[in-house]
């Protein structure tokens, strides 16, 4: 997993699946964010379903949107 400079990584649970590979994720601290799948996860056909535990990478500029970078098994 390549770490991006200044990005915040936090764990959460997928609440619902939205169109265009977007997901609503509830973070461990209670906040809800909108997240999309990272390109590497798309390339390797990693499927994400509601109730999956994931790691979300948030930008310090917009804490309401993020990128799903890892799905726990």
Swiss-Prot record:
Record bears the keyword rRNA-binding: yes
Q: Name one Pfam family in it.
A: eIF-1a
**InterPro entries noted in UniProt:** NA-bd_OB-fold, RNA-binding_domain_S1_IF1, S1_domain, TIF_IF1
Q: Which GO terms describe its molecular function?
A: ribosome binding; rRNA binding; translation initiation factor activity
GO CC, alphabetical: cytosol
Q: Where is the S1-like domain?
A: 1-73
Tell where it localizes: Cytoplasm
Q: Write down the SMART domains for this protein, in alphabetical order.
A: S1 (SM00316)
> Keyword Membrane: yes or no?
no
Ordered alphabetically, the record's keywords are: Cytoplasm, Initiation factor, Protein biosynthesis, RNA-binding, rRNA-binding
Which CDD domains does this UniProt record tie to the protein? S1_IF1
What does the protein in this record do?
One of the essential components for the initiation of protein synthesis. Stabilizes the binding of IF-2 and IF-3 on the 30S subunit to which N-formylmethionyl-tRNA(fMet) subsequently binds. Helps modulate mRNA selection, yielding the 30S pre-initiation complex (PIC). Upon addition of the 50S ribosomal subunit IF-1, IF-2 and IF-3 are released leaving the mature 70S translation initiation complex.
Q: Oligomeric state and partners?
A: Component of the 30S ribosomal translation pre-initiation complex which assembles on the 30S ribosome in the order IF-2 and IF-3, IF-1 and N-formylmethionyl-tRNA(fMet); mRNA recruitment can occur at any time during PIC assembly.
The record's similarity note reads: Belongs to the IF-1 family.
| Name assigned to this protein | Translation initiation factor IF-1
């Amino acid at each position: 997993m390549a770490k991006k400079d200044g990005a915040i990584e936090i764990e959460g649970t997928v609440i619902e699946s939205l169109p265009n590979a977007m997901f609503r994720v509830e973070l461990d601290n209670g906040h809800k964010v909108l997240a999309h799948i990272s390109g590497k996860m798309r390339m390797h056909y990693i499927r994400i379903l509601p109730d999956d535990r994931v790691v979300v990478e948030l930008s310090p500029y917009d804490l309401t949107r993020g990128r799903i970078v890892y799905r726990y098994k």
